[in-house]
Amino acid sequence: MLSPEAERVLRYLVEVEELAEEVLADKRQIVDLDTKRNRNREGLRALQKDLSLTEDVMVCFGNMFIRMPHPETKEMIEKDQEHLDKEIERLRKQLKVKVNRLFEAQGKPELKGFNLTPLNQDELKALKVILKG
């Protein structure tokens, strides 16, 4: 039987470990999805170089190659890219929340600048106008 102090420390360590595992799992998933996104980008680039739109192309699905029409293949890869972009963005947002919870559990201050978001095109144009003018 553990003392109340030892139980409290044990609960704290378990909580921190669980949060850290979630952070690491999300990071790993982001890396895996980014790798897939890069492979898709390579495939799209190869399709752009191949100017014969009438011929079918060979596409690898897992461990199987399938012959598909060029336009359908390009459209399918582009849709997959959009899905991967959305999934990676969702995971990154989740990761920020999980890292903040982990830091909070450890008693560390929140990361400065961690919640920054990039400027969109309109904001960037407005900033350039202000700086020039």
Curated annotation (Swiss-Prot):
Predominant location: cytoplasm
Compartments, record wording: Cytoplasm
MF-aspect GO terms: unfolded protein binding
Presence of the UniProt keyword Chaperone in the record: yes
Cross-referenced InterPro entries: PDRG1, PFD_beta-like, Prefoldin
Statement: the UniProt record of this protein carries the keyword Chaperone: yes
Keywords: Chaperone, Cytoplasm
CDD domains in the cross-refs: PDRG1 (cd22860)
Pfam families: Prefoldin_2
GO biological process per UniProt: protein folding
Gene3D superfamilies membership: 1.10.287.370
GO cellular component, one term: cytosol
Family: Belongs to the prefoldin subunit beta family.
Task of the protein: May play a role in chaperone-mediated protein folding.
Subunit structure: Component of the PAQosome complex which is responsible for the biogenesis of several protein complexes and which consists of R2TP complex members RUVBL1, RUVBL2, RPAP3 and PIH1D1, URI complex members PFDN2, PFDN6, PDRG1, UXT and URI1 as well as ASDURF, POLR2E and DNAAF10/WDR92.
Name assigned to this protein: p53 and DNA damage-regulated protein 1
Organism: Bos taurus (Bovine)
Gene name of this polypeptide: PDRG1
